[in-house]
Amino acid sequence: MATPAPSASHPAPATAPAGAPTPAFQPRHKIRLVTATSLFDGHDASIHIFRRIAQATGAEVVHLGHNRSVREIVDAAIQEDAQGIAVTSYQGGHNEFFRYMHDMLRERGAGHVRIFGGGGGVILPEEIAALQAYGIARVYSPDDGRALGLQGMIDDMLGRCDFATVRAEEALPAFTADDHRALAKAITLVENHPDKHRETVQKRLAAAAYVPPVLGITGTGGAGKSSLIDELLRRFLLDFPAMRIAVLCVDPTRKKTGGALLGDRIRMNSASDPRVFVRSMATRR
């Protein structure tokens, strides 16, 4: 059967305009992404948009908020065993900030963590090229926004982060309380492959010389849980200068998308102390 030529009664098929949003990316792995704005930067509107779209695309987003230092961001990425870091920087110090972050990750054995940045017109094209040549995974420009759209940029970012940080066949690592990277890997192994490591965990707990006390805190959203925990951390660190403490935070996974917002770190100012280990987890159900 012949196809009629385009006319008023038979218009030509519509085509997607250049830069139109792409179908949402479907990750193969559980992607964990740390989001923040850079130090001395209160412009957080854009990072909020990006972390919401990333969450809606299936990522588990650990949001730190604005005015975060390189060390705070790197500490969070290591403790959370994240595949990527997304930071907006509008304060003019992006060249030093992103390079310092890249170097610190490598020094601490986390060079696999992808760094993504953006800063509108503040970051010049030649600076973007230099940062990406240095090892920053991608710095998105206004031209990228026009060409890819918001969803397209998120798809590109998550696609670069869609890899496993641990392998199912790995043995549960031995670690000490101050080895946050090994501890984070152990939690990821148990979280991703619980059946394989359940017996090992139970044996280690049974053989432990000291069983620390465990305090559970729960409540409705906005009840002040994170603020209360931050105050407990502050007092603990002051009263017990030789002891360490760990905080495990659990937030719900969105059933429709599989993503989650893990935002408890925003209110925990004392969590930046090296004697504190924080891990955010999604229910994944």
Model-inferred region functions:
Residues 191-212, 223, 229-285:
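Nucleotide-state-sensitive switch-loop elements of NTP-binding domains
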